[in-house]
Amino acid sequence: MQHSTSPALTPLPTRVRNPLVFRQITVKQADTVAGCFRRIVFHGDQLKGFSSAGFDDHIKIFFPDRETGELHLPQVTPEGIVWGDQRPASRDYTPLHFDATTNELTVDFFIHAQGLASDWAVAAKPGDGLAMGGPRGSLVVPETYAHQIYLCDESGLPALRRRLLALAPHQHITLTVLVSLHRPEAKAYLADLDHVQCEWLPADAAQLNARMAALALPPEDSFIWVTGEGEGVKAISDQLIERGVNPDRLRAVAYWHQK
């Protein structure tokens, strides 16, 4: 007698912890991409040993004092992190690519009005210095889920790009990519990825909720990634869980908050 068996499910994502290391890095190259991103390539000996196992990892970038140009870094002690009198301004960014042979780290900065990081990135030139810490931890998401859904806005495009590049060899997966745009020119950011068909959506919370509500939920061997503005991400996450999505196969992260 033959017994039918269901296909084995892809394992759940796993978390990896990394030692906390602060590094000073230097701009090697800076270019504008898709009209609204600055692609900065950093280098430096302190990048030796850098590791980023998760496609949506974040590193914390510390910016120089706007008046003095000085970088103020903490000390890492057995008791924890010790900051000096001046704690530098910082922002979180996704490591797009790291080349361990050349110790070069690529980070894409989304350019928007009146942003500390945006202002720095627009003016960045070879030789400029920054400091960074992390990633402190990674969520390692298998690439072989049969069905994968990704939803983000411009803030999540670097992580999405990194993921889509990694998925390119996997021809068997069913991929749904939804991107909410405040700036239409950002469409060009993924234009070179011929294996991906994106659905471009307006930056409207009600329309995003409606689109996700209309989306057919994938079978069990699936992964869903949702990022963007905090309240919108929570609303979509709650909706998906109410519809029966396994929370262990859903990654919902607020990348920014409406003020």
Where are these regions (language model features)?
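Extended, composition-driven regions rather than compact fold-specific motifs
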Residues: 1-259
